[in-house]
A protein has these predicted regions:
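Secondary-structure transition/capping motifs at alpha-helix termini
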Residues: 118, 260-264, 337-340, 358-359
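Helix-loop-helix junctions that connect adjacent transmembrane helices in secondary transporters/permeases
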Residues: 290-323
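Short, hydrophobic/aromatic alpha-helical segments in well-folded domains
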Residues: 22, 212, 238-239, 253-256, ...
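Active/binding-pocket-proximal capping segment
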Residues: 292, 298-303, 346-361
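Short, flexible loop/turn elements at secondary-structure junctions
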Residues: 13-15, 101, 127-130, 152, ...
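C-terminal substrate/ligand-recognition segments
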Residues: 282, 287, 313-358
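Glycine/tryptophan-enriched, flexible segments
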Residues: 121, 142-300
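Trp/Phe/Arg-rich N-terminal binding region typifying the photolyase-homology
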Residues: 1-163, 267, 332-333
Length: 361
């Protein structure tokens, strides 16, 4: 008799149905799949806006799961403890998840995998958040890349996996485990009135992200190389929030751009290069995790930075009241729309660090 013990699908930054390798593999077994999202310390450490946006994404993804006869189980606590509880409650014998790459997530996931396998359970991690796993791209001497252009040259000719289709259905367990009600988590509480301001600009969920990608490839990508650095022009994809939560995959974006490139849209390659900048950032973080807490160049460690965020100058920067029109407009853009144009981010950060001499931390 085939194994019918459930598989726990541990969700994090992969709130989509299509091109979801972990979900695809779980459904392919024919066994019941229990999608679960855990509110642990990594979630609680998020700022007000990301936490609010996560809440919106979870609510929307729960509806998507319901459309395929599934549910989203919500639990709170340390991931290893919550997963152990769910295994005990459901009789699950496997945990599948999509890999993350920051040091905290790596340590957590490694501990979960070691514990699960030590108990005789199946524990499998899958790609999907990146096109090129950080350990698969190396210099000729076997080291990591530290400069973007050689990194781009190393990956530009590689085959990128074709996006996987969404499952037609998700096998459900006979009995669902207890779940928290999302509203009790109050993920948007700290946003207060800001939620009403930003909400109209949110591109929420997988369907909206895919629609925007199609719209972008059908139009703006043709002038992406010329318009992407002009903050006043609608020349970017606007998909950062969806990529961050995994409501769309980089593979989907890559292949849409590649199709445009094959149709003669030369500037599509510029967009593909920007997708690889994202890959490069993860590559650096994975191989040099100290970047999250230390200067890239040690010679800046003894620079007399201003580390007091309460100074009038820094507060004016935060509030968009520096008197420098571009900087202030960029900050207001972020507060109103939840986004800031890439070129504006560079200028705003430069003003803070190079003009006000404030430490980036």
């Amino acid at each position: 008799m085939p194994d019918q013990s459930p598989i726990l699908l541990w969700l994090r930054r992969d709130l989509r149905l299509a091109d979801h390798p972990a979900l695809h593999a779980a459904c392919a077994t024919g066994r019941p799949v229990i999608p679960v999202f855990i509110r642990d310390g990594a979630v609680d450490d998020l700022g007000a806006a990301p936490k609010w946006r996560l809440g919106l994404g979870l609510a929307h993804f729960a509806q998507s799961l319901a459309g395929l006869g599934s549910q989203l189980v919500l639990r709170q606590g340390p991931a290893d403890r919550v997963l152990a509880d769910l295994i005990a409650e459901t009789g699950a014998s496997a945990i599948y998840w999509s890999r993350l790459y920051d040091p905290q997530a790596q340590a957590r996931d490694r501990a979960v995998k070691d514990w699960a396998r030590g108990q005789g359970y199946e524990a499998r991690s899958f790609g999907g958040h990146l096109m090129f796993e950080p350990w698969t791209v190396a210099t000729k001497t076997g080291g990591e890349y530290k400069v973007y252009t050689p990194f781009w040259r190393a990956v530009r000719g590689r085959e990128v996996d074709q996006p996987l289709p969404a499952p037609a259905r998700i096998p459900a367990p006979q009995t669902w485990p207890q779940s928290d009600a999302l509203e009790t988590w109050q993920l948007g509480r700290a946003m207060q009135r800001g939620a009403d301001v930003v909400a109209p600009y949110v591109r929420l969920g997988e369907a909206a992200a895919l629609a925007r990608l199609a719209e972008f490839v059908d139009g703006p990508i043709a002038r992406y190389d010329a318009l992407r650095d002009i903050p006043a022009a609608p020349g970017t994809s606007g998909l950062s929030e969806n990529l961050a939560l995994g409501e769309i995959s980089p593979h989907q974006c890559w292949h849409a751009a590649l199709a445009a490139l094959h149709q003669g849209v030369a500037s599509a390659e510029t967009f593909m290069k920007e997708l690889v900048w994202r890959e490069f950032a993860y590559h650096l973080m994975f191989h040099t995790p100290r970047l999250l807490s230390q200067n890239w160049k040690a010679e800046w460690d003894n620079f007399p930075w201003n580390s007091d965020a309460s100074t009038p100058q820094v507060q004016a920067w935060l509030q968009g009241r520096t008197g420098v029109e571009f900087v202030d407009a960029a900050m207001r853009e972020m507060y109103v729309t939840g986004r800031m144009h890439n070129r504006a981010r560079m200028i705003v950060a430069s003003y803070l660090c190079k003009h006000l001499l404030s430490h980036w931390q």
